[in-house]
Amino acid sequence: MQAPQTTVDPSEIAKFEAMAAEWWDENGKFKPLHMLNPCRLDYITTQIAGEFDRDLASPEPFKGLRILDIGCGGGLLAEPMARLGADVVGADAAERNIPVARVHAEQSGLTIDYRHTTAEALAAEGEQFDVVLNMEVVEHVASPIDYLIACRQLLKPGGLQVCSTLNRNPKSYVMAIIGAEHVMRWLPKGTHEWSKFITPDELYDLLRQSGMDPVDRKGFVFNPISWSWKLSGRDLSVNYVTASVKPA
């Protein structure tokens, strides 16, 4: 049997392999994601609750939903989804991330199925999910359209994909490359390549080409005064997130 094609970029994976042990250090190399996580979770939970008619005030609102966190890293999103009752699979192409994620989940009393694999491999295996979380991954793959097609194949009809990435414009270069990597040193230099960033309109087009119906998009906006992130319906100039649905 022929192995599935992959959009994994080995040079991108190597960057995150080198940082694997630091995933749960809130002041370490993944500090930006820890800061962004409450905002990401706000958007994700709202979209899932709306799409599947779930009450977020209930004890386990996502019980019965199967969620894939692709590019799961150390489990910063997978763990909250499990706490909300979902059956969670966390997948990452960086092998060293998986034992870090597994140990932390065990220490937290959570059952999460972590796998060293890719979207393409999971699709080839016939895996199906209600929700695919595709957060800060698409700007690191070799072929965004092929990757997004694999993500669509992983969804059940009527399933939801939440995809976040970085806009490509002068402001995002200043904020995400110069600011985050060189000035603030939140991330190691070279973590991102500005040429791989994707504009919101480009991402909407790619989602449609992959067979998805985009239904929403918001910006993640950093406030340097409060040192926190917020969702914005208008400012998609740097970080942004989209929701799309697979036709039933």
Curated annotation (Swiss-Prot):
Matches recorded under SUPFAM superfamilies: S-adenosyl-L-methionine-dependent methyltransferases
Keyword S-adenosyl-L-methionine: yes
Recorded catalytic activity of this chain's protein: a 3-demethylubiquinol + S-adenosyl-L-methionine = a ubiquinol + S-adenosyl-L-homocysteine + H(+); a 3-(all-trans-polyprenyl)benzene-1,2-diol + S-adenosyl-L-methionine = a 2-methoxy-6-(all-trans-polyprenyl)phenol + S-adenosyl-L-homocysteine + H(+)
Enzyme class: transferase
Pathway(s) per entry: Cofactor biosynthesis; ubiquinone biosynthesis
Any one GO biological process: methylation
Gene3D superfamilies to which the protein is assigned, alphabetical: Vaccinia Virus protein VP39
EC numbers, comma separated: 2.1.1.222, 2.1.1.64
Keyword Oxidoreductase in record: no
UniProt xrefs under CDD domains: AdoMet_MTases
Molecular-function GO terms, alphabetical: 2-polyprenyl-6-hydroxyphenol methylase activity; 3-demethylubiquinol 3-O-methyltransferase activity; polyprenyldihydroxybenzoate methyltransferase activity
Record Pfam families: Methyltransf_23 (PF13489)
Residues the entry annotates as binding S-adenosyl-L-methionine: 40, 71, 92, 135
Keyword set, alphabetical order: Methyltransferase, S-adenosyl-L-methionine, Transferase, Ubiquinone biosynthesis
PANTHER family in the cross-refs: METHYLTRANSFERASE (PTHR43464), UBIQUINONE BIOSYNTHESIS O-METHYLTRANSFERASE, MITOCHONDRIAL (PTHR43464:SF19)
Function in brief: O-methyltransferase that catalyzes the 2 O-methylation steps in the ubiquinone biosynthetic pathway.
Protein family according to the UniProt entry: Belongs to the methyltransferase superfamily. UbiG/COQ3 family.
Name used for this protein in its record: Ubiquinone biosynthesis O-methyltransferase
Species per Swiss-Prot/TrEMBL record: Roseobacter denitrificans (strain ATCC 33942 / OCh 114)
Lineage: Bacteria, Pseudomonadati, Pseudomonadota, Alphaproteobacteria, Rhodobacterales
